[in-house]
Amino acid sequence: RPRIYFEEWDEPMISGIGWVSELIEIAGGVEAFPDLATRKSAPERIVTNEDVIAARPDIIIGSWCGKKFVPGRVQERPGFGQIPAVRDGFLREIKSTIILQPGPAALTDGLAAIEAIVAEWLETRAAAGAATAAQT
């Protein structure tokens, strides 16, 4: 199961709210910051570069509340090159309109988007494993 950091905002970096964390788990992922997900207000879910580096997410999903997620800005953060998601290129966007508003869209479209990202990650891992096995 991939560890997922869901970034709701970039400056300051804010991790995902509770229902997003639940959708990550339902989709087959592991929430990178489960303790923060239970906190309702955004200021209580602020994380630092060091927090994200220590969490070592396999996938980073950005949903920057109405502005476009820019993977390059995430990749340029100090120390982020050592994070598996950044090293392996697993930075994805989910539009905030389908994930950050509680209700039917989050439960259908938002969940489906997370499931697709998790499935892509699993397929990539399986292909890498098969390639490694073929070399031995």
Regions picked out by a protein language model, each given a short descriptive name:
Residues 1-108, 112, 120-134:
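Binding-cleft/active-site segments that stabilize strongly anionic ligands or cofactors
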